[in-house]
């Protein structure tokens, strides 16, 4: 072991310090002149420089192709949703401006087929480039034709029907002036736009050059002009050269009916092609071979031609012709000859229905009647629009239906309302009185913002107008769980006609100021109440109640209540005995009783309470009198005039016979039935004469007026005393 070896000493590492954080001044050189210039700059100037930097970044974003693509996709999504607002048109103009101003940094998209287009990274040129001042020179119909024809050229390029700058597709603008649209000679199909098309006449002279400086292929237009001159029904002509079409045109058998596409073409015409058409004899021969009804013409060893009454129909026939030629070429290559093929019978072939049925589950009415090729062409236009071509094609029937939000209170909330609660000059506070005044306005605003249970569907074009019309249809289905609807004045499942009639009736009542007690109670309707008339009850018979039929059973009472209700049984018995005594007694007895009555004062303690003031009907339970007179004499009588003085009671006049009988009572111990509260005084002849009419009216109340034949009229008059109110008036006159 070495002597230098020593014991190892374990030492701990020094404590680690916190890492140094980089600060702003560590990254800035204080001696840098740029830093010194920025530090010494005024704050306003420094802010202006910062704003310039921000604007520079915004300009870079606006000029970037990625931003343009994003903006274009957003606009396309808004177009699919429909209901284009005003702001969407502004976005479209911005997108068009950005598309035209931004340079195409990516390589151009390879043309010649749909697969090549899907692999491309470049931006396509829009078909509908008629913007601003370019669209003023054309009417609406020509704009649509230009967009359709330019989109047709793009479709021909995507399907591979183009042959460099050759082949032509033309359309007739109008029949009056015989103007036609054709592609400029030297322009590829992928470059054709609506504004670049050239307008020519029937001789091939240029009428409108469009947006290019290119001319027209006169030799190529000769074929089209010959067909247009011979067929006034032709609106569009397509002339293309495809390999399969050229192969079929070279076959002696021609186009064989071996596929449905071949049978859908109808009668196929053939023409022996001898080169470029330059003379008139060739035109006449083409017109003769085409005939008046053929839609398809095959040029021998050259190409294919289709004629249509519209752009869509011409596309339909040329597409089926190309497909039929490809099927025939491939079939003959595999079959070994036309003798080995099975041919279809054109007489048994049934054409496809052009009008599809109504989609299931929809109640929006019948779909538009499609013409030949319209449905297929519209589907392809939709494809081009989805790819960003912006064809400008007017769609007749939308493919995607907007799914309605079922059971939602607000489908599309109102963006603008015509009612405002506060003006610009208001302070923001609202008084309670003004708040109450605005209640009706708030209810109307809430109703305007509420949704409706209908769905809006777009109707397609019809023969009279190319515009689409909005049609409201009822929403299918019903809510399973609903809450109480506030202010529901019209109940559900109510006939609208009845509601309108009731509303008009209420308005008429308000105009005529007719106020009633309201509707009749449904609970007590039809319940009849039979009330038995109690004797002595006063029944009111109101004319208004009877006329309004609120009380059908009304008893009209012509007499008053019973005056004997206040008398006791003892008093009634005494009255009955006195009446019998009067009937049996003689005149002498009556005179004696009268004299005794005058001598002896009446007993004031036996005076009963005064009878009621109203003339009443006697009770039916009074004892029957032994005479043969009718009970109606004692039960009914006409009421006497009441006393006009408030101090004296009027009952004394109502019952004079009762008072007289009480004075004629022979028994002094027996209390009379009725007595006058004032002391009796001798009647005067004048008073008797004045009182005679009143007593004659009350004579039916006298029990002995009819029964005793021995009584003379003079003694009847002596029985009655002078009424109290006449005595009082006489005293006043004497004084």
UniProtKB/Swiss-Prot annotation:
Modification type N-acetylmethionine: residues: 1
Residues found modified as Phosphoserine: 12, 59, 64, 334, 353, 355, 364, 366, 408, 427, 431, 436, 464-465, 481, 586, 600, 605, 613, 705, 708, 712, 714, 724
Pfam families, per database record: Aldolase_II
Composition skew (Basic and acidic residues), residue ranges: 440-455, 576-601
Keywords: Acetylation, Actin-binding, Calmodulin-binding, Cell membrane, Cytoplasm, Cytoskeleton, Membrane, Phosphoprotein
Subunit structure: Heterodimer of an alpha and a beta subunit or an alpha and a gamma subunit.
Name under which the protein is recorded: Alpha-adducin
NCBIfam families recorded: PRK07044.1
Function: Membrane-cytoskeleton-associated protein that promotes the assembly of the spectrin-actin network. Binds to calmodulin.
Biased composition (Low complexity): 1-11, 698-712
Organism whose genome encodes this protein: Mus musculus (Mouse)
Major location (coarse): cytoplasm
Domain of life of the native organism: Eukaryota
GO biological processes: cell morphogenesis; cell volume homeostasis; cellular response to calcium ion; erythrocyte differentiation; hemoglobin metabolic process; homeostasis of number of cells within a tissue; in utero embryonic development; multicellular organism growth
Residue ranges, compositional bias (Basic residues): 713-735
Phosphothreonine: residues carrying this PTM: 331, 358, 429, 445, 480, 610, 614
Cellular location(s): Cytoplasm, Cytoskeleton; Cell membrane
């Amino acid at each position: 072991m070495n002597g230098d070896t020593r014991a190892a000493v374990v030492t701990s590492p020094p404590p680690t310090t916190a890492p140094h954080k980089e600060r702003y001044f560590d990254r800035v050189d204080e001696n840098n002149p740029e830093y010194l210039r920025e530090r010494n700059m005024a704050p306003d100037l420094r802010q202006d420089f910062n704003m310039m930097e921000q604007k520079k970044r915004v300009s870079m974003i606006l000029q970037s192709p990625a931003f343009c693509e994003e903006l274009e996709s957003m606009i396309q999504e808004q177009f699919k949703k429909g209901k284009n607002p005003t702001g969407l048109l502004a976005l479209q103009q911005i997108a068009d401006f950005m598309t035209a101003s931004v340079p195409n940094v990516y390589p151009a998209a390879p043309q010649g087929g749909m697969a090549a287009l899907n692999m491309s990274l470049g931006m396509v040129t829009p078909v509908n480039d008629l913007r601003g001042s370019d669209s003023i020179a054309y009417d609406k119909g020509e704009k649509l034709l230009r967009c359709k024809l330019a989109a047709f050229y793009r479709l021909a390029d995507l399907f591979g029907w183009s042959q460099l700058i050759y082949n032509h597709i033309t359309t007739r603008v109008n029949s009056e002036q015989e103007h036609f649209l054709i592609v400029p000679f030297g322009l590829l199909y992928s470059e054709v736009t609506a504004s670049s098309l050239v307008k020519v006449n029937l001789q091939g002279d240029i009428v409108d050059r469009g947006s290019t400086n290119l001319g027209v292929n006169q030799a190529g237009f000769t074929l089209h002009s010959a067909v247009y001159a011979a067929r006034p029904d032709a609106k569009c002509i397509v002339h293309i050269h495809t390999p399969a079409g050229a192969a079929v045109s070279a076959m002696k058998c021609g186009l064989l009916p071996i596929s449905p596409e071949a049978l859908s073409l109808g009668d196929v015409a053939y023409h022996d092609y001898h080169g470029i058409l330059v003379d008139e004899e060739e035109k006449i021969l083409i017109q003769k071979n085409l005939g008046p009804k053929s839609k398809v013409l095959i040029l021998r060893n050259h190409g294919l031609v289709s004629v249509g009454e519209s752009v869509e129909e011409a596309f339909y026939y040329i597409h089926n012709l190309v497909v039929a030629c490809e099927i025939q070429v491939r079939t003959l290559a595999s079959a070994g000859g036309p003798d080995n093929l099975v041919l279809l019978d054109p007489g048994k072939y049934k054409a496809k229905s052009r009008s599809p049925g109504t989609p299931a589950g929809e109640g929006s009415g019948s779909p538009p009647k499609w013409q030949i090729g319209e449905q297929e062409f519209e589907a392809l236009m939709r494809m081009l629009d989805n790819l960003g071509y912006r064809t400008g094609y007017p769609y007749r029937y939308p493919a995607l239906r907007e799914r309605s939000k079922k059971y939602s209170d607000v489908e599309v909330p109102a963006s603008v309302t015509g009612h405002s609660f506060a003006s610009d000059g208001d302070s923001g506070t609202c008084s309670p009185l003004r708040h109450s005044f605005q209640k009706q306005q708030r209810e109307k605003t809430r109703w305007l913002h509420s949704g409706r249970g209908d769905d809006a569907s777009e109707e397609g074009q019809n023969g009279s107008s190319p515009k689409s019309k909005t049609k409201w249809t009822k929403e299918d289905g019903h809510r399973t769980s609903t809450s109480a609807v506030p202010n529901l004045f019209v109940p559900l499942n109510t006939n609208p006609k009845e509601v309108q009639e009731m509303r008009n009736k209420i308005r008429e009542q308000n105009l005529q100021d007719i106020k009633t007690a309201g509707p009749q109670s449904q609970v007590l309707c039809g319940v009849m109440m039979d009330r038995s008339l109690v004797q002595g009850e006063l029944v009111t018979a109101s004319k208004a109640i009877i006329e309004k039929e609120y009380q059908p059973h009304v008893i009209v009472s012509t007499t008053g209540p019973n005056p004997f209700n206040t008398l006791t049984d003892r008093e009634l018995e005494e009255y009955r005995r006195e009446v019998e005594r009067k009937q049996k007694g003689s005149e002498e007895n009556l005179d004696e009783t009268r004299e005794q009555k005058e001598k002896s004062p009446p007993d004031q303690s036996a005076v009963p309470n005064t009878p009621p003031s109203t003339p009443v009907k006697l009770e039916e339970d009074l004892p029957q009198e032994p005479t043969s007179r009718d009970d109606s004499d004692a039960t009914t009588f006409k009421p006497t005039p009441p006393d006009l003085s408030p101090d004296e009671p009027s009952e004394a006049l109502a019952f004079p016979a009762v008072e007289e009988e009480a004075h004629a009572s022979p028994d002094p111990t027996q209390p009379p039935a009725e007595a006058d509260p004032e002391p009796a005084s001798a009647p005067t002849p004048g008073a008797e004469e004045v009182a005679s009419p009143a007593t004659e009216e009350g004579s039916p109340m006298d029990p002995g007026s009819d029964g005793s034949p021995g009584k003379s009229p003079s003694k009847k008059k002596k029985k009655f005393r002078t009424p109290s109110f006449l005595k009082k008036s006489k005293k006043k006159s004497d004084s």
